[in-house]
C-alpha cells in the first residue's frame, strides 16, 4: 500500500480484537462493535506550529494504538483494504508490549 499522509495525519489499519459479553460469551463481527485499536501503517512529517517549526509525531509506523473512532476519523479503501485517516490528536494511547 502506497500512501503518504500530510502534516500530523496518521494512517491506521483497524485490528480485530476479541470481545466478551458480561456473561463471558465471545462476541464476533457486528455483535462486538468496531475495534478502536489499530496498527499505524504511515505517518506524516509532523504538526506545523505557529512559528513555522515542525513538531514530529509521537507515533511511528508499527505502533499499536487506541484511538477515538468518531468525528474526524475518515475511513478509506486503498488497494481493497480499509484504512483510517486521522490526526495524531485522535490517538488516545500507544499500546506497549
Curated annotation (Swiss-Prot):
Q: Which CDD domains match?
A: cpn10
Q: Which GO terms describe its biological process?
A: chaperone cofactor-dependent protein refolding
Q: Which UniProt keywords apply?
A: Chaperone, Cytoplasm
> What InterPro entries does this protein map onto?
Chaperonin_GroES (IPR020818), Chaperonin_GroES_sf (IPR037124), Chaprnonin_Cpn10_CS (IPR018369), GroES-like_sf (IPR011032)
One GO term of the cellular component aspect?
A: cytoplasm
Q: What is its main location?
A: cytoplasm
Q: Which domain of life is it from?
A: Bacteria
- Give the family from UniProt: Belongs to the GroES chaperonin family.
Q: Which NCBIfam families match?
A: PRK00364.1-1, PRK00364.1-2, PRK00364.2-2
Its name, as the record gives it, is Co-chaperonin GroES
Gene name linked to the record: groES
Amino acid at each position: 500500500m502506497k500512501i503518504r499522509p500530510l502534516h500530523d495525519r496518521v494512517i491506521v489499519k483497524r485490528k480485530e480484537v476479541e470481545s466478551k459479553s458480561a456473561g463471558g460469551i465471545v462476541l464476533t463481527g457486528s455483535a462486538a462493535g468496531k475495534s478502536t485499536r489499530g496498527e499505524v501503517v504511515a505517518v506524516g512529517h509532523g504538526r506545523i506550529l505557529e512559528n513555522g517549526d515542525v513538531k514530529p509525531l509521537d507515533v511511528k509506523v508499527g505502533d499499536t494504538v487506541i484511538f477515538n473512532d468518531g468525528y474526524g476519523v475518515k475511513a478509506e479503501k486503498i488497494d481493497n483494504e480499509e484504512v483510517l485517516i486521522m490526526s495524531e490528536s485522535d490517538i488516545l494511547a500507544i499500546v506497549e508490549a
